[in-house]
């Protein structure tokens, strides 16, 4: 599951292919960046002459591996949702009346959602769906009240901060 999800997510930005020994090879512009094993083991291109651009891409891939490992690990050990209409989802986290859940399909990969749920957990409502794990974690933190929305930067504020740096 980990390797398939990594391949799906990396395929959008990099050239990927499986080799004969079970490694996912990742390259960009014909330059090999790394190889990833089914369990997330990572071997990067050790060429000392790689440009900063390609080193940045390798760092991006490592971040992607870390993120995918996080949610795949949570998913593999998470209980099924109690609510009948969403029983194909697994509960990754809950706080108060807010739940973060995920569903996986071979064809489409992961879909994440935050819901409000009743006290018994047998009914959910006001779903916020996304395939983006980072977005849904933030949505969960805000919707559950763990982080006040006013403490987050808007896209415009983030852009202004980046221009100042």
Show which residues each predicted segment covers.
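A cross-family detector of function-defining hotspots
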Residues: 23-27
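A structural microfeature
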Residues: 32-38, 44
């Amino acid at each position: 599951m980990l390797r398939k999800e990594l391949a799906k997510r990396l395929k959008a930005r990099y050239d990927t292919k499986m080799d004969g020994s079970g490694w996912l090879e990742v390259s960009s512009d014909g330059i090999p960046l790394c190889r990833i094993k089914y369990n997330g083991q990572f071997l990067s291109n050790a060429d000392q002459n790689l440009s900063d651009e390609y080193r940045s891409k390798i760092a991006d891939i490592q971040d992607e591996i870390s993120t995918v490992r996080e949610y795949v690990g949570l998913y593999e050990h998470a209980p099924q949702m109690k609510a009948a209409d969403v029983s194909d989802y697994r509960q990754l986290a809950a706080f108060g009346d807010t739940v973060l859940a995920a569903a996986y399909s071979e064809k489409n990969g992961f879909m994440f959602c935050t819901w409000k749920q009743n006290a018994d957990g047998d009914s959910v409502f006001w779903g916020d769906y996304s395939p983006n794990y980072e977005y849904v974690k933030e949505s969960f933190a805000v919707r559950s009240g763990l982080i006040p929305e006013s403490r987050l930067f808007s896209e415009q504020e983030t852009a202004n901060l980046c221009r100042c740096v």
